[in-house]
From Swiss-Prot:
Annotated Pfam families: Glyco_hydro_1
Protein name: Beta-glucosidase
Gene: bglA
GO molecular function terms attached to this record: beta-glucosidase activity
Origin: domain of life: Bacteria
Length: 450
């Protein structure tokens, strides 16, 4: 048996996102988001699912916070629905929406749980999309207005803030690959969006400092990790592009004030470049307090200039590893490698694992429980790598499992379950899974024994 220790002040938590759990999509003055529009469009989401009700967390604050308390987490990462507080994206404030988040945060604090707030987890107000969305600089100004509102409303209660969750998804998965809302397929638009997101991030960080908010602010890119099929220059560069596409492209401008040259050159060779205007890079390039690491899987890649290699000429091939039910290969060592790379490149900043978890669609057994041993095994092997990172001097301060409960899994609908808590979508009954009790034990002890 080996013991894997974590510091006594380690921030154990779980994570969710507004559109995936809240429901109440047209109640109490909430405006429409791009995900409402997308999910209501036939063929965009599997089974025609949508977030109209989701987990109904909007009406179940006390019940869900009690689950968090029972689990024993120190922090709860959630996101704010921008159209719930600013239905048109700017202008008139929806007080009922703000009151909901005050109730949630107050309930968390009353139960000894720190709120860890994400400002933007993909649910752009549709009113702003109608004006060009993140492809327009109008949305940068709108985001600054929204961020200032939330800092003033909740800055005295929330000490940790994330500006954007997984900007690669918002830029490229949503506007180049077309898989997520708003469903565009335009590479230049995706590059424009990625730049505008970073400028908006810079605006929010500036406001956070100017308002004197006490706490930390950072960003959570979906930093992928690709390993080369062969140790050739071509395959290693193919992996560098995959990692740079989702990670370095967002973190380099923040930390170094410029985009990574290898990615700029790649885009320019294809005929594309980001829409930089005077002052943008200076605004983006300012200190943040932490980086959020979202990690689920790795890929093995090789150079392929053909169709299979895609825009990056980088083809993902199977590692031959076991897969979760969503089809993602399991490679826990990739989490360590990603933490090591991020620490080494960016000066060993404070890191939080802001998402890590597994999709397994285990149902209720005859005994009324959900025996999700595969999820327990997945979490254990990744926590071992997190512990290893801490032992090796990486400044990792917390771990937030994805997710507290089964929820609306974006374009996959409700068919893919990531939760520690099972949700019956017909009755909305919550049932903690075996992994819930296992994770509760890890949190209470502060160590793993395997």
């Amino acid at each position: 048996m080996s013991i894997h220790m974590f510091p006594s002040d380690f921030k154990w938590g779980v994570a969710t996102a507004a559109y995936q759990i809240e429901g109440a999509y047209n109640e109490d003055g909430r405006g429409m988001s791009i995900w409402d529009t997308f999910a209501h469009t036939p063929g965009k989401v599997k089974n025609g699912d949508n977030g109209n009700v989701a987990c109904d967390s909007y009406h179940r604050v006390e019940e869900d916070v009690q689950l968090l308390k029972d689990l024993g987490v120190k922090v709860y990462r959630f996101s704010i629905s921008w159209p719930r507080v600013l239905p048109q994206g700017t202008g008139e404030v929806n007080r009922a929406g703000l009151d909901y988040y005050h109730r949630l945060v107050d309930e968390l604090l009353a139960n000894g749980i720190e709120p860890f707030c994400t400002l933007y987890h993909w649910d752009l107000p549709q009113a702003l999309q109608d004006q060009g969305g993140w492809g327009s600089r109008i949305t940068i100004d709108a985001f600054a207005e929204y961020a200032e509102l939330m800092f003033k409303e909740l800055g005295g209660k929330i000490k940790q803030w994330i500006t954007f969750n997984e900007p690669w998804c918002m830029a490229f998965l949503s506007n180049y690959l077309g898989v997520h809302a708003p469903g565009n397929k335009d590479l230049q638009l995706a590059i424009d969006v990625s730049h505008h997101l970073l400028v908006a991030h810079g605006r929010a960080v500036t406001l956070f400092r100017e308002l004197g908010i006490s706490g930390e602010i950072g960003i959570a890119p979906n930093t992928s990790w690709a390993v080369p099929y062969r140790r050739t220059k071509e395959d290693m560069e193919a992996c560098l592009r995959v990692n740079g596409w989702s990670g370095d492209w967002y973190l380099d401008p923040i930390y170094f004030g410029e985009y990574p040259k290898f990615m700029l050159d790649w885009y320019e060779n294809l005929g594309y470049k980001p829409p930089i205007v005077d002052g943008d890079m200076e605004l983006i390039h300012q200190p943040i307090d932490f980086i959020g690491i979202n990690y689920y899987t790795s890929s093995m890649n090789r150079y392929n200039p053909g169709e299979a290699g895609g825009m990056l000429s980088s083809e993902a091939i199977s590692m031959g590893a076991p897969k979760t039910d969503i089809g993602w290969e399991i490679y826990a060592e990739g989490l360590y490698d990603l933490l090591r790379y991020t620490a080494d490149k960016y000066g060993n900043p404070t890191l939080y694992i802001t998402e890590n978890g597994a999709c397994y669609n285990d149902g209720l057994s005859l005994d009324g429980r959900i025996h999700d041993q595969r999820r327990i095994d997945y979490l254990a092997m990744h926590l071992i790598q997190a512990s290893r990172a801490i032992e090796d001097g990486i400044n990792l301060k917390g771990y937030m499992e994805w997710s507290l409960m089964d929820n609306f899994e974006w374009a996959e609908g409700y068919g893919m379950r990531f939760g520690l808590v099972h949700v019956d979508y017909d009755t909305l009954v919550r049932t903690p899974k075996d992994s819930f009790y296992w994770y509760k034990g890890v949190i209470s002890r502060g160590w793993l024994d395997l």
